[in-house]
Amino acid sequence: MSHHWGYSKSNGPENWHKEFPIANGDRQSPVDIDTGTAQHDPSLQPLLICYDKVASKSIVNNGHSFNVEFDDSQDFAVLKEGPLSGSYRLIQFHFHWGSSDGQGSEHTVNKKKYAAELHLVHWNTKYGDFGKAVQHPDGLAVLGIFLKIGPASQGLQKITEALHSIKTKGKRAAFANFDPCSLLPGNLDYWTYPGSLTTPPLLECVTWIVLKEPITVSSEQMSHFRKLNFNSEGEAEELMVDNWRPAQPLKNRKIKASFK
């Protein structure tokens, strides 16, 4: 059962393969992005992020991160162009972060770790719903954005202010009118490669689009993330920190860059 996995010594990423053998597959994520070997591909289009009618619904602690969930019943918020064919709908975003500011991201750049990483998860509308999309190699497009320590982010402020209400696993709170555009950097240059979900079931259904330019987050804002709990209410407190999977082997994949 997938609720057995986590990020501790006993149930963490090193052990996921026992229950999810695809953990050792050929297109696992995250990966280290070696900027020396990533190839500029002039055929890659700029990303088209159409979040103008976006409708956020709730914020939820699922016991391994927290998700901000969106209404994906229509094309309210879509990602297209870039390396993608067709249109991909935003369903949720979540973060991965560390126990300290020196680690937390899942992807790394020339082995450098960032303090956190934002994943905006989109599914290919040609498959009808998220559950069907994950069964296909082009089912999902995940936009990955690094967070580096610096000035506080206005976009993140609304999120950090809501976290106290979802401290423990299973808690959910209304979270309307959040504009995910507030979490995008000014420059949308990206790296792209074929990969997987970074949490079980680790399905190899993701076109990864990792932005080169990080957004900033203050140490104070990061401290709110680290007050969340992996556990449910009434259980022994386990702080939600280091919920990141380390870089996986690239195997025969190539990482392409949209920029020179």
Curated annotation (Swiss-Prot):
Ranges for domain Alpha-carbonic anhydrase come to 3-259
- The source's superkingdom equals Eukaryota
- The record lists substrate as bound by T198, T199
SMART domains with a match to the protein in the record: Carb_anhydrase
What does the record note on quaternary structure?
Answer: Interacts with SLC4A4 and SLC26A6. Interaction with SLC4A7 regulates SLC4A7 transporter activity.
Give the EC number. Answer: 4.2.1.1, 4.2.1.69
| GO annotations of cellular component type | apical part of cell; axon; basolateral plasma membrane; cytoplasm; cytosol; extracellular space; microvillus; myelin sheath
Might you name a Gene Ontology BP term for this protein?
A: cellular response to fluid shear stress
Sequence positions bearing N-acetylserine: S2
Provide the alphabetized UniProt keywords: Acetylation, Cell membrane, Cytoplasm, Lyase, Membrane, Metal-binding, Phosphoprotein, Zinc
Describe regulators of its activity. Inhibited by acetazolamide.
Subcellular location per UniProt equals: Cytoplasm; Cell membrane
Q: What is this protein called?
A: Carbonic anhydrase 2
UniProt cross-references to InterPro entries, sorted A to Z = CA_dom (IPR001148), CA_dom_sf (IPR036398), Carbonic_anhydrase_a-class (IPR023561), Carbonic_anhydrase_a-class_CS (IPR018338)
